[in-house]
């Protein structure tokens, strides 16, 4: 920006006006829960990045994971590694929904829970407190999970 003659004030104003796109890291701060919405897309790298962010947040910290799509033959292993990685970061709980995400919940161990349906997951999240990240590939429809968490806080 500076090379193009844009001054620091204009850069600061532009950055200050930035609003994240829903599903791409937006935050909702409720009375008892902070929701980090990462529900638009998921792959192994972006899941680890989202877990790294959550690990630095106030607890209890819950990672809500839906299936990662389009990752080929390594899908089960990638989900299992996600659960192991979340555990290694000290994340308090991992809630999962989707046939592949079941491997993440199992690998997470104690505090890992798997739900067969999105509705069952949403029901289990009622009363959740602390900080929660919602991460899934778009086809999982986890924007509904984000909305439910927000509605529970209003």
Model-derived features with residue positions:
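ATP-dependent carboxylate-amine ligase
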Residues: 1-154
